[in-house]
Each structure stands twice: as structure tokens, then as C-alpha cells.
């Protein structure tokens, strides 16, 4: 790895300083060297070494404003804000045009959640700084803390006007556009940015994300393609290009992208799972199953992998294998209602109705209150002859679905089967009132009830 001249000097200074600590000899460093050493240790979380360097630095350079400002930064880092503020006031009396004094004052107010005051000091710093980009970025962050996304966006854009390579600011601009649901505006801005910086792979990638959000998948692929042409190893752009191809139902192209992703990085369970789904959509069941199995081999605790294999076997109508794999998924996440629902459906297909009833019950207990959960559950209970329990569940469901014909027709059928004809007629009338056309629900699920003369008379009477 080639180091820049500045990095090489910093490395030598660090080696010299650490050698001094080991030998107890005292070496001389200029104040800027000390600043770099201290900031390096702070950035790497070695605060004790930073403090040692600061102490020695101030002994050798007691009047250094730069070192005292680093001291302020350290005090702010340790939440010693009052001491830091006092020291800043002393420095202000000496150097009132030093932008770093205002930046550190802003940091103190920001730490106190006084973001408007922080912005005031940062605006003063703008008068004295040469690094406008950095200050605009800090102002943008303060506005973010205040949830003022418009002004945050405005300042991040100003930062990028000064420094087009500040990718942190670019991400923040896009974050603001996203949060404000301004995808179209984001596209306009990013296109202008790209006109000036055509080789910014990050900008192309963000442009692709905006097109994807607007479901313009052709344009998304186009933008991601440019990002990957500029940087062939841009994994994020490659992955999102693959997702866009999937949306366009271009599954082979998506697979090709995922293959590149695997070459660049160790195969993740997510990539393997996506490839499996693409192969299945192409009708290649053998490759699909192979990649589903690779998915769970890569991450045995990925419940989505096991459930994907379950769904694969359900589509193949191989319910015995589907049952094996859905049990694997439930073993990992036993509180997922969707898994219990599949468990129930698979057991129903295998005519294991008691197990199916247990599955729907567990789905409900895990938070599934969808209409079809109640109807499927009670259909199984009806088959098991548990009419009373089925009625109780459907009556509970009417609290969530008070005007639902599927529930009313089922209640009618169950009450008639239980010889509670008055209640049966009441719910039959409700069903006919809510949806006369779909009265065949009663015929499909309760054929014996449907053929009753009393029921046919009631239907004929309602039609009149």
C-alpha cells in the first residue's frame, strides 16, 4: 500500500511518539505533529494516549492555540462542556477570527441540544473559514437534528457546490429528498450533479435508487449500469441492478448480476436466495432447489431460506417435503404467524386436519387476524365436527370484520348444522344482504345445509 507524503509523516510521528513512551526519553515535536497524534488517538478510541500526547504537547508548546483547540475537542468528547466553554472564551479573546473557535462553540451547543445556537456560531465560522464545505455540512447536520429537512438539504447542497467529492453530504442530500418524498426533485438534482461530475459512481447509484423508488426499473438499470461501469466492484449498484432486472422479469440478467456479486464477495444467503427464486421463475426447478439448499447451508438459521424451500415444494405439490421444511422454519422463528399458516395449509393438503387446526390456532395466537385465517381455521374445525368452537371463533371475528359475507354464510351453515335454525336464518339473511351473488359460499362449504328446503325458500324469498 502506497502512503501519501502526509500519511507517511504522520506514521513516523506516531512511531517516534510511541518509542518515546517506551523509553521514557523526551523527544521534541512541533505543535502540528502533536495535533495529528492526539486526533489520531481520539479517532481510534485510545483516549489515555491522546491525553498523554496533549499533556506533553502543552508542556512543549504552552501558547499553541491549535493544541488548546484540540484540548477543547477532547473536553467536548468527554462531555466536560463548561470547562471547554471557558477555555474557548479565553481563546476567543486572543484569536477572535479563528473559525475553529466558533466550530467548537457550535459543537458545545449541539451537545446541549441547542441546535439553533449551534447554527448561529457555524454561520459566524463561515466568515473566517477556507473550508466552506465542512461548515455547510455541519450546518446541514444541525438542521437534521432539528428535523428541518428542507434547510438541511439546502446546506448539504451548498457543501457539494464547494466539494463535489463529499460523498457523506451527497448521501445526506438524498436522505433529505427521500424523507420529503421528493423522488422527482432528487432525480433533477442528481442529473445536474452528474452533468458536472459524470464519473461519480455514487451519484449514478443514488440516481438509480430514485428511479427504482418510482418503479421506473428500466431507468434504474440504466443508472446502475453507469455506476458499475465506473466502478466494476461497486457491489451495492450490482445488487440493485439485479433487483431491478427482477422487477422487469429479466431473471437471467438478474442471475448474471448476482453471479458477479458472488465473485466480488463471499456468497451471502441473500444472494443465493435471490438466485434460487430467479431460477424458479425461469422454470429451472433443479437449479432453483440447488440454490435454495445452498442458501440454508450458508445460513442454517435463516428462516426465510427454509420457508422458501417450503413454498417451492408446495408449488411442486410435494407436501411431505414441504412439511419437513416448514418445521425447520418454525424451529427458528416459532412466533411467525406466516410460518404457522403455511404449516396449517400443508397439513390440510395432507389431510392432517387436527395438525392443521393447531397451525391456524398458533397463527392467530402469534398475531395473524386476517380474514382468511379465521375462515380457513373454522373450515377445518367444521370438518372435525367442532361446530361450537368454530362458531365462537367466527363470532369473535365479527368484531374485526362486522360486515363480512364470508363470515355470515359460514355462521349460517354452522348454526343450521347445530340445529339452531333461528340463528341460522339470521346469519343467512345477513349474508344475502351483504353479498347475494356469493351465496354459493354456503353451497360450497355446507352442501347439506344448502339443499334444505327451508334454506332455499329463504333465498328465494330474499330475491323477491
PLM regions: where:
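TPR/TPR-like (Sel1-like) alpha-helical repeat modules
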Residues: 365, 413-440, 463
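Structural marker of alpha-solenoid helical repeat scaffolds
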Residues: 60-61, 93-95, 128-129, 162-163, ...
